[in-house]
């Protein structure tokens, strides 16, 4: 019914029902019931043919105005129709599908005045775009190469204009000083401005493009002037900076990378001196600790061992290389064990201090969760009722004897259920107000159990708001019942 109501000729449904556009649905329904009783074919014997069109129009008006969405659409169309001098649609195609429906809505909502304004605004924007294109000069152009015969070649490419660094400033060219421009500021080559040829280079997108190119050139310079060998030589296997390894110069970095794995004989590995002030690391070969460990495992018993140092954040002092004296090894082992124990003691002391602070925080939070302390201070909230709210019946659309009788019987049952529901929730609302007054008198800054208080407050507030919503629904049901009674009395002349 909603489709036919909006695709026929425009009819003011407010005028048909005798209501205002600001009237509520209760007032509109009162007028509808009066008119239905007056123009019903059964109440007009002998005049059925005259009354039937008016009765159908009243029914259609009520179907549109009772639905909030349909009523909003009708109000919008009513405003559009009021603004036209003729008041009718000028474009009415055949109703052959959904496409025609869309075109009808679009064509009917655009007047001649609005179309003229749109055209003037579009022309003004085009003129501004043309002016802005003429003032923009860039350092990138789309070159189109031509052959000797004058025909354009197929290979059109986007090429960068070769200019010196002195003529480029912030990604733009100066027309007066650039070599590709003449004295009058025009280009010396057959170039096409990309701003006028493609919309991709308009506005801030083109500036971002130049900025990306500039940043990429800076990154390329950093890669060329900062070799990766310097970074790898200054870090150990765990990514921690090793102070015993010095960074080589850029000139010698390439040679060190090429000769890294050349000297891998046992003699070169065994007789490498430790990193001490007497033996600086400049004279060492560039061998990683992993390679030293792999070669040291294959050494013979007659040759001295090379101690392997685990990578740490702080480099340890070098240990003496001796196998004949077991006492020196035992002293080194005990010293390392003492260092490890001291480190563990420091960590345990720090952890105990942290645990003490954590325990103090947990004790302060435990006071809030103690049920006995909370029960002594906070008032007890009332329990929320579990009774369900009744739903009022809908008013009948057709005023027949059976529909009116069933509506009145169902409303009587609803009234009984509402009476018991309202009594229970009224008592709960009274107890809830007492609970709130007690909470208002508390010193909430020094009161434990605030989380429980917030939960109780949310639960009670939601229950009271739901009761008020059902109360408003009950009030609307009473208004509909009163309007139905008035329409029935008016139909019988009482």
From Swiss-Prot:
Domain J: start-end pairs: 12-78
Transmembrane spans: none
Chloroplast recorded as keyword: no
Protein's UniProt keywords contain Cytoplasm: yes
Molecular function in Gene Ontology: Hsp70 protein binding; unfolded protein binding
UniProtKB keywords: Chaperone, Cytoplasm, Cytoskeleton, Microtubule, Nucleus
Positions of the UniProt region annotated as Disordered: 229-354
Function: Has a role in the proper organization of the interphase microtubule cytoskeleton. Required for equatorial microtubule organizing center (eMTOC) disassembly into satellites, contributing to the dynamic redistribution of MTOC components for organization of interphase microtubules.
Name of this protein: DnaJ-related protein rsp1
Organism, as annotated: Schizosaccharomyces pombe (strain 972 / ATCC 24843)
Record gene name: rsp1
């Amino acid at each position: 019914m909603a489709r036919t109501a909006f695709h026929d000729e425009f009819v003011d449904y407010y005028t048909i029902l005798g209501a205002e556009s600001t009237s509520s649905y209760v007032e509109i329904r009162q007028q509808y019931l009066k008119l239905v009783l007056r123009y019903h074919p059964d109440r007009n014997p002998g005049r059925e043919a005259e009354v039937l069109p008016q009765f159908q129009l009243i029914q259609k008006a009520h179907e549109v105005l009772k639905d909030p969405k349909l009523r909003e659409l009708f109000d919008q169309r009513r405003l559009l129709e009021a603004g036209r001098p003729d008041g009718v649609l000028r474009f009415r195609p055949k109703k052959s599908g959904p496409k025609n429906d869309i075109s009808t809505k679009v064509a009917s909502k655009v007047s001649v005045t609005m179309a003229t304004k749109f055209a003037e605004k579009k022309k003004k924007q085009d003129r501004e775009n043309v002016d802005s294109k003429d003032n923009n000069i860039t350092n990138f152009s789309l070159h189109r190469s031509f052959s000797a015969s004058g025909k354009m070649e197929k290979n059109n490419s986007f090429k960068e204009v070769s200019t010196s660094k002195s003529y480029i400033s912030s990604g733009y060219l100066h027309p007066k000083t650039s070599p590709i421009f003449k004295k009058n500021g025009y280009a010396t080559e057959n170039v096409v401005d990309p701003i006028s040829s493609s919309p991709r280079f308009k506005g801030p997108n083109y500036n971002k493009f130049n900025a990306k190119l500039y940043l990429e050139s800076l990154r390329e310079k950093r890669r060329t002037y900062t070799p990766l060998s310097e970074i790898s030589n200054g870090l150990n296997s765990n990514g921690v900076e090793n102070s015993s390894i010095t960074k080589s110069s850029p000139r010698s970095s390439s040679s060190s990378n090429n000769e890294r794995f050349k000297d891998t004989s046992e003699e070169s590995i065994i007789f490498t001196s430790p990193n001490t002030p007497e033996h600086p690391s400049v004279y060492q070969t560039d061998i990683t600790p992993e390679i030293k460990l792999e070669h040291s495992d294959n050494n013979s018993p007659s040759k001295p061992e090379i101690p392997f140092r685990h990578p740490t954040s702080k480099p340890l002092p070098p240990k003496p290389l001796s196998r004949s004296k077991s006492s020196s090894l035992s002293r080194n082992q005990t010293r390392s064990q003492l260092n490890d124990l001291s480190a563990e003691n420091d960590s345990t002391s720090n952890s105990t201090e942290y645990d003490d602070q954590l325990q103090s925080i947990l004790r302060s939070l435990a006071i809030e969760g103690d049920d006995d302390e909370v029960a002594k201070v906070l008032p007890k909230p009332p329990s929320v009722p579990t009774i369900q709210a009744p739903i009022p019946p809908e008013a009948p659309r057709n005023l027949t004897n059976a529909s009116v009788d069933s509506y009145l019987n169902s409303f009587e049952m609803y009234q009984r259920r509402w009476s018991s529901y309202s009594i229970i929730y009224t008592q709960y609302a009274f107890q809830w107000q007492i609970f709130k007054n007690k909470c208002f008198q508390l010193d909430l800054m020094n009161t434990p159990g605030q989380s429980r208080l917030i939960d109780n407050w949310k639960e009670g507030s939601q229950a009271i708001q739901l009761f008020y919503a059902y109360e408003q629904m009950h009030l609307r049901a009473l208004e509909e019942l009163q309007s139905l009674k008035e329409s029935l009395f008016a139909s019988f002349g009482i």
